[in-house]
Swiss-Prot record:
It is found in: Cytoplasm. It comes from Enterococcus faecalis (strain ATCC 700802 / V583). Specifically methylates the pseudouridine at position 1915 (m3Psi1915) in 23S rRNA. This is Ribosomal RNA large subunit methyltransferase H. Keywords: Cytoplasm, Methyltransferase, rRNA processing, S-adenosyl-L-methionine, Transferase.
């Protein structure tokens, strides 16, 4: 299985990079995973609704440029479906069984995702109604993907 994570912005925090790299190393025995960072759109602190929409659209076009037609796309969205770790694992397993072996996960920028990215997605998922820094969500998502494979293979993992 090939897994791609498309994110907006460059990760700068060393502790997050180290955590992500640790889980990527652990994931190697289950799946090939790559992380693609697209540039975030520079914008002033205060934006009008039209300017926010424009920023999301520009970032959205960059995201869509990294997604292929044959990929099953999950986007992280606050209003997405909430899954337990076991349900998430089952979802990935079922996709693999049905022949969908190219999975892409998308984490938007600080303003969220454009409508065009949401429309391209096959599934919107959420890690709850709380708001998290999008950089931190990279680590959380990669850990959950790793956890999902451990669960799928019947291997022990902390609950």
């Amino acid at each position: 299985m090939k897994i791609k994570l498309v994110t907006v912005g460059k990760l700068k925090e060393k502790y997050l990079i180290q955590g992500i790299n640790e889980y990527l190393k652990r994931l190697n025995s289950y799946a090939k995973m790559e992380i693609i960072e697209v540039p975030d759109e520079k914008a002033p602190e205060k934006l009008s609704d039209a300017e926010m929409l424009q920023v999301k659209e520009k970032e959205g076009q960059r995201i869509l440029g990294k997604i292929n037609d044959n990929e099953y796309v999950f986007v992280l969205a606050i209003n997405g479906k909430q899954l337990s770790s076991e349900e998430f694992s089952k979802e990935i397993e079922q996709l693999g069984i049905s022949g969908k072996s190219n999975l892409t996960f998308v984490i938007g920028g600080s303003l969220g995702l454009s409508d065009s990215v949401l429309q391209r997605s096959n599934q919107q998922i959420s890690f709850g109604r709380l708001t998290y820094p999008h950089q931190l969500m990279r680590l959380v998502l990669v850990e959950q993907i790793y956890r999902g494979f451990r669960i799928m293979k019947g291997e022990p993992y902390h609950k």
